[in-house]
């Protein structure tokens, strides 16, 4: 989260006559350790964990160990303090609602659509699907600190149309007003062999890109029932 520029002032200052200022694309990254609390109990043992190394902190997940990256926490730092990796405690947490709202006030932003986070890029099908529910619960709890100002975007998988419809209905009941779908429908076969899983994981961005060469594509009439549910629920979609 960037340091706010206080020169912009407040959108609610006297004399402002153009209505609320709405930021249509802010980003929120959940804390790395939130999965242990928000995944279904049956999946929590598989959640990512933070390991404190001598040089930096590491995120350990499914046999991989990667450093905590600081690249999105450089705004406002002096050049001499620039660093690519570091510790969780050094990050300016985008998930702190008080800091988020204070920055919005300084920038004159009244309300915001909040993208980011989403499911785990997992090799495990059950964990992958469960992470959609876990993220939805976390981000809605986070937004509940200012529900009139923070509007989180939900996530839904797109491997099977009926499966997606069930996720959309669940998100609507939770209060989401916008849902992000993968850019292309996903290949449901990708979870069945180790080679396909490897291709799926390396080719997806946050498990949300999909398969542009797949047999199922959004323009096909099979998707009409999904579009109808989205309209009936008053849900806006984004890709």
Residue ranges and their predicted role:
Residues 1-239:
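Helix-coil boundary/capping segments in enzymes
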């Amino acid at each position: 989260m960037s340091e706010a520029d206080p020169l912009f002032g407040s959108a609610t200052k006297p004399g402002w006559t153009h209505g609320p200022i709405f930021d249509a694309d802010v980003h929120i990254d959940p804390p790395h350790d939130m999965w242990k609390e928000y995944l279904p109990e049956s999946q929590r043992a598989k959640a990512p964990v933070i390991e404190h190394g001598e040089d930096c902190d590491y995120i350990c997940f499914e046999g991989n160990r990667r450093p905590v990256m600081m690249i999105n926490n450089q705004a406002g730092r002096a050049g001499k303090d620039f660093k690519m990796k570091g510790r969780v405690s050094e990050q300016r947490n985008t998930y702190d609602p008080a800091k988020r709202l204070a920055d919005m006030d300084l920038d004159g932003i009244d309300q915001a659509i909040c993208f980011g986070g989403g499911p785990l890029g997992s090799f495990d099908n059950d964990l992958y699907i469960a992470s959609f529910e876990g993220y939805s619960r976390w981000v809605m709890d986070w937004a509940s600190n200012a529900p009139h100002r923070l509007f989180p975007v939900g996530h839904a998988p797109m491997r099977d149309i009926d499966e997606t419809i069930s996720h959309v209905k669940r998100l609507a009941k939770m209060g989401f007003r916008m849902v992000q779908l993968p850019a292309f429908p996903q290949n449901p076969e990708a979870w069945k062999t180790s080679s396909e899983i490897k291709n799926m994981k390396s080719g997806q961005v946050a498990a949300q890109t999909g398969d542009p060469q797949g047999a199922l594509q959004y323009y096909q009439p099979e998707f009409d029932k999904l579009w109808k549910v989205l309209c009936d629920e008053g849900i806006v979609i984004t890709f």
